[in-house]
Amino acid sequence: MARHVFLTGPPGVGKTTLIQKATEVLKSSGMPVDGFYTEEVRQGGRRIGFDVVTLSGIRGPLSRIGSEPLPGKRECRVGQYVVDLTSFEQLALPVLRNAGASGRPGQSICVIDEVGKMELFSQPFIQAVRQVLSIPGTVVLGTIPVPKGKPLALVEEIRTRKDVKVFSVTKENRNHLLPEIVTHMQSSRK
């Protein structure tokens, strides 16, 4: 049976909301859960970027709408957003590196929301995700984008792993998926 669960679907369909709800249910049933999710940042009703938020409540910028790049400075951009790699790595990497640190098999769940274009500018993040997926005692609950344009190597690698179950989230099924996701996560730990 697939051990890890990844949600996929178009932007704004409710992947992060489902992750947050599943996390609450799993935590309240006594499972150790750690990780991070991404959240829109809005100003005056307009999206200006994304924050990365750890499950322990630490928040930092992932990206913001950018102005012109500074001369000579290499900038990581996705569309109009400039990615703050330093901030992202300071928050996400320690969480991923601590995954499975309890050392007891089947004892931890690691939330990775998301493995997407912005996050994949970070080579250490790519390595850390691969490592977490291979730790025997760790189950990953994550999100990946819908394939469009040029394939993202790590996303395709995750999508095709034998130990990963991918749920496609749609407006039609998003309100019914939670019990299935939670049940799968709980049975993956046994």
UniProtKB/Swiss-Prot annotation:
Regions crossing the membrane: none
Enzyme Commission (EC) number: 3.6.1.15
Indicate which residues the UniProt annotation says bind ATP: 9-16, 109-116
Q: What is this protein called?
A: Cancer-related nucleoside-triphosphatase homolog
Family matches, as InterPro entries? Nuc-triphosphatase_THEP1 (IPR004948), P-loop_NTPase (IPR027417)
Tell me what reaction this enzyme catalyses: a ribonucleoside 5'-triphosphate + H2O = a ribonucleoside 5'-diphosphate + phosphate + H(+); 5-methyl-UTP + H2O = 5-methyl-UDP + phosphate + H(+); CTP + H2O = CDP + phosphate + H(+); ATP + H2O = ADP + phosphate + H(+)
Family as reported in the entry's similarity comment: Belongs to the THEP1 NTPase family.
List the SUPFAM superfamilies.
Answer: P-loop containing nucleoside triphosphate hydrolases
Q: Which residues carry this modification: N6-acetyllysine?
A: 165
Q: Does the keyword Cytoplasm apply?
A: no
Molecular function GO terms recorded:
ATP binding; ATP hydrolysis activity; CTPase activity; GTPase activity; ribonucleoside triphosphate phosphatase activity
Function summary:
Has nucleotide phosphatase activity towards ATP, GTP, CTP, TTP and UTP. Hydrolyzes nucleoside diphosphates with lower efficiency.
For this UniProt record, the keywords arranged alphabetically read as follows: Acetylation, ATP-binding, Hydrolase, Nucleotide-binding
**Residue positions, PTM N-acetylalanine:** 2
- Quaternary structure (record): Monomer.
